[in-house]
Amino acid sequence: MKALMFGWEFPPHILGGLGTASYGLTQGMAAQGDMETTFVIPRPYGDEDKSFLRIIGAGDTPVVYRDVNYDYVRERLKGKMDPELYYRLRDHIYADFSYLPTNDLGCFEFSGKYQDNLLEEINNYSIVAGVIARSEPFDIIHSHDWLTYPAGIHAKQLTGKPLVVHVHATDFDRSRGNVNPTVFGIEMDGMNHADHIITVSDLTRRTVIEKYHQDPAKVTTVHNAVTPLAPSILALPDRRGVRDKVVTFLGRITMQKGCEYFVEAAAKVLERTQDVRFIMAGSGDMMDAMIRLAAERNISDRFHFTGFMKGQQVYEVFKASDVYVMPSVSEPFGISPLEAMQCG
């Protein structure tokens, strides 16, 4: 079976757990022996692991015809896309998108992040999905989270192939119930068009059924997992450099993750003992607020903000920690606690 999969992140360039989950899932699918996956991301860098899947960059897929020669295409897309694929995709441009801003190859520019023009990028990504769906052979469409639901819907409408949407979280989780109506509408549209829905936990399944009014028969829970650690990771030493106990939060520093509770709890602990240090590893829109909160509680000298961490950095932090804390107010299925448990 061939799957056309849409996702917003893929390692090593990730911004959260979505890319990590996508990597593990596609790796597991490839291990079944009868699955071939083509994974579409907004902006590939060329250093992604392609040993078990194909990667197509939405930002390398033409939506406007440009008369460019082979050598130029090869140089511009070096390490990301073969010229043959570029020309094949160009032959499947299905409408006039010349009124939209594109580059010298007739492609949209994508940040691949979560910027202020995110809705514009989501729309452009869905346009690209139409070009790819017309040119690629596949049996099923798989869309990860709301950002790629419009792309999945478009691919289904063009080809009639079945659509599976994979719900890693809903806006009820991300917003503490203060739902963004635009995001909610995109989520609802994706679920309504889906032939089947995968959720990462029974909690998320209940949310999908109750809040999005989906038929329970078409919603299945498939839990996340982690890959067994390599011996080199297991052998990482504890490099904390202090005798103090270390308590760690690792995740997106956002409203959903309850990061302010971690800071407040740290302040209460430090009222009783001073031989503890606290690490807040990650990044997000509440990071500056958490730095200010730590200063207001006069605990900045015991608090360490590392910024975003990935790969081996994550395991180095866990190896140097005594306690991992997950104060999330809503957690569909956290991958970080599994990674922490792997480190003991």
Residues of each region from the PLM?
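Short alpha-helical donor nucleotide-sugar binding micro-motif in glycosyltransferases
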Residues: 308-309, 316-321
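Short glycine/serine-rich donor-binding loops of glycosyltransferases
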Residues: 334-337
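Nucleotide-activated donor-binding/catalytic signature segment of Leloir-type glycosyltransferases, i.e.
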Residues: 289-309
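Conserved donor-binding/catalytic core segment of Leloir-type glycosyltransferases
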Residues: 198, 241-266, 279
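Carbohydrate-associated surface elements
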Residues: 203, 225
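A conserved catalytic-core segment of Leloir-type glycosyltransferases
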Residues: 35-133
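Aromatic "clamp/platform" in nucleotide-sugar-dependent glycosyltransferases that forms part
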Residues: 329
